Amino acid sequence: MDKKHCTLESINLSGCIILDKDVSGVEFDGADFTYARFERVNFTGCSFENCVMENTRFTDCRMTDMQVEGCRMFGAEFVGGELTGTEFRDCGMQSSGFLHTDMEKVAMVHCERHGMLFYSHGQREQILEHSSMEEI
């Protein structure tokens, strides 16, 4: 799946396990990632628009300078890895978790965040200080 700088529309990766890939620069539009698992995947510069990422798990992934807009992300988990410079806009992120994830300069704009979990020593202070998150 090393398809850099392309657009993937309405692709169904529901339940897939993707390991050790570089998909930097890919635009995902209307993709379904429900219950998918990504480990050590490089998503640098990717965009996700109107995707379903419910109960999707991202482990030790590099997710820098991404745009995520209009996505359903109920129960998504981000474990380890990096989310630096990423913007989430108009996403449903209820019950999502960010565990031991570097989240410097992350923006969550007009996102539903009820029940979100942030877990890492000192991470809550980092998020409040360096991210624009409405009504934490």
Regions found by a protein language model. Give the residues of each.
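Tandem repeat scaffolds
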Residues: 1-136
